[in-house]
């Protein structure tokens, strides 16, 4: 093995070992580290909510596999596979949506379920400074990727609401093992928003429905509240001019940086996001 190849192998091994320790410490609420892993977007924001204990052997085997998959990412396909492995390690099952459900949703004119990558969730939700007093609502939660992220990386309670009952049932089936998580089958327009202090949207509906949702949130949600809108391309204007709303942060995400510092294009085009704060009308 050449010097360069040997150096890369050693770095990957160290990265895998460090990620392995960080991953399960953060999942089990034991980490005291405040630094993210090199080249990733996974800073540790203490404190953590402990997840339900899994058998030690399953934890070790699962964390080893996930650590190895993230350490060796060289393409978008690798990143998708690593996120899928992380789903299984966190949730005890795959969050994949089978082809028949996707076909049914497409025939009904519903947006195809698209889970947010973990590195995007860390970039958007990990920087909010949420506390144990907050409560997050993922609007259009699908099978529960945001809930999985919340269980291991956020100190607050989290709820997902999903219009398609089959997807909601998948999220509910594994989230039931976590006392700080729950999933609801139904429309966000039909549930009370009173308990929530933070909302996450990954382009779940068109502008007309978004406007109805914003009206409802203003009436019902706890104030002040924060709203994170990923892939708001073309819809950010819906917030502009609404009394009481303030733009906290905005930008775009397209690339993922690997452990070696290489950038991989994840989205074909930059996906715009915005973070808003609603404090009510003065």
PLM features: residue spans?
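Conserved SAM-binding strand-loop segment of SAM-dependent methyltransferases
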Residues: 178-187
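Conserved SAM-binding motif I beta-strand of class I
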Residues: 157-162
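S-adenosyl-L-methionine
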Residues: 55, 60-131
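Glycine-rich SAM-binding Motif I of class I
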Residues: 144-148
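Conserved class I S-adenosyl-L-methionine
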Residues: 133-140
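Conserved SAM-binding loop
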Residues: 171-172
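C-terminal substrate-binding/active-site "lid" region of AdoMet-derived donor-dependent transferases
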Residues: 208-273
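A short SAM/SAH-binding and catalytic strip from SAM-dependent methyltransferases
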Residues: 197-209
């Amino acid at each position: 093995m050449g010097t360069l190849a040997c150096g890369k192998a050693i770095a990957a091994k160290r990265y895998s070992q460090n990620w392995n320790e960080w991953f399960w410490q953060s999942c089990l609420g034991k980490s005291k580290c405040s630094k993210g892993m090199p080249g990733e977007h996974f800073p540790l924001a203490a404190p953590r909510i402990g997840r339900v204990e899994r058998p030690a052997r399953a934890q070790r085997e699962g964390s080893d596999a996930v650590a190895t998959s993230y350490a060796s990412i060289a393409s978008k396909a690798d990143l998708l596979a690593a996120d899928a492995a992380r789903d299984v390690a966190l949730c005890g099952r795959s969050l994949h949506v089978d082809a028949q459900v996707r076909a049914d949703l497409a025939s009904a004119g519903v947006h195809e379920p698209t889970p947010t990558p973990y590195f995007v969730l860390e970039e958007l939700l990990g920087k909010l400074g949420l506390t144990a007093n907050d409560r997050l609502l993922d609007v259009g939660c699908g099978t529960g990727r945001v809930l999985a992220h919340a269980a291991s990386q956020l100190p607050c309670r989290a709820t997902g609401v999903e219009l398609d009952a089959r997807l909601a049932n998948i999220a509910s089936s594994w989230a039931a093992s976590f006392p700080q998580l729950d999933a609801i089958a139904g429309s966000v327009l039909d549930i009370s928003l009173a308990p929530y202090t933070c909302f996450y949207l990954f382009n779940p509906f068109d502008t007309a429905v978004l406007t109805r949702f914003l009206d409802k949130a203003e009436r019902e949600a706890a104030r002040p509240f924060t709203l994170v809108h990923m892939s708001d391309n073309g819809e950010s204007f819906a917030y502009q001019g609404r009394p009481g709303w303030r733009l906290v942060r905005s930008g775009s995400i397209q690339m993922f940086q690997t452990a070696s510092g290489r950038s991989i294009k994840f989205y074909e085009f930059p996906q715009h996001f915005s973070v808003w704060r609603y404090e009510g009308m003065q």
